Amino acid sequence: MNRRSFLGKTAAGLAASGFLSSFPNSILAMSHKKGINMPLGFQSYVYRDVIGQKPEETMKLLASYGYKNVEWCSPKGYQGPFAPLVKYSGKELKKITNDSGLQTTSCHFTWKEITNDESLAERIEFANQLGLKHMVCSGGLMAKTEDEVKKRCDQMNHVGELVKKGGMIAGYHNHNGEFDEKFSDRPQYDFMLEHIDPSLVKMQFQVAAITSGFKAQDYFRKHPGRFISAHLQDYSPSDHKKEVVMGTGIVNWKDFFAAAKVGGLKYIFVEMESDPSVMQGCAAYIKNI
């Protein structure tokens, strides 16, 4: 998707142009009675082209959809569209978030900024100011050999130890690559689970792995208690590259949330990064699942 197309879809999502009408007010206003016992969150990367320039406006819009929690991307690590937020301290960004009607409990950090002890110490201070519970590494464990993956897992365990001393929990976020790339027909992700110390590092599951043939709920049940959160995506049955409103795609969400309890999930973050216009519909679906 090119930048112009993405911005068009983002603008449509921000303006809720035509989309509000497809969900009756009675549905949108309903509380989450049946209870997924986790706050409804979203990943800020979805709105990367606007949230850096207009953080309050963007977050207030998402709060109006029913979202309660935002997972930030480290401005210093991600730069790019998040660069305008670098000027804020953790305390300042927390105030902006709270004043917009949201909480923040988790943030993504890049491999480069957390695998240097000096940089990590500064990031831990920022995270504590922001009020985080989880510091999630956005990737970096994949490698060409098993030995190199093990070495990187050892690095991640070291990060987890320092984050734990800082009063938080470290997490690791997968992408499809951890499943697509294999050693002896086993996904690299499985190998990572063997070498990551669960007492130091938990996992954040990217549901998009379903498009590579791997279901989050299978991992939740096979590895109970090892997951702290998940990024939620859903895809058209006829086109697995097309993001759709949750509940209209290929993911069995009732089974997902049943298994999430076993997996240990504390937070969920909707992340429809190629089509922000479906974010409101996803909020409505989750509140009424």
Task: Set out the residue ranges of the language-model regions.
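Active-site-proximal loop/turn and secondary-structure-junction residues that shape catalytic pockets
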Residues: 46-48, 74-76, 110-113, 141-143, ...
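Glycine-rich, proline-tolerant flexible connector loops at the mouths of alpha/beta enzymes
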Residues: 71-92
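Active-site mouth loops of central-metabolism enzymes
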Residues: 41-53, 108-117
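Histidine-acidic metal/acid-base catalytic patches
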Residues: 4-41, 48, 53-68, 183-201, ...
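Acidic (Asp/Glu)-rich catalytic clusters
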Residues: 32-35, 59-64, 85-104, 121-131, ...
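Active-site acidic/histidine proton-transfer and metal-coordination neighborhood
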Residues: 10-16, 20, 96, 100-103, ...
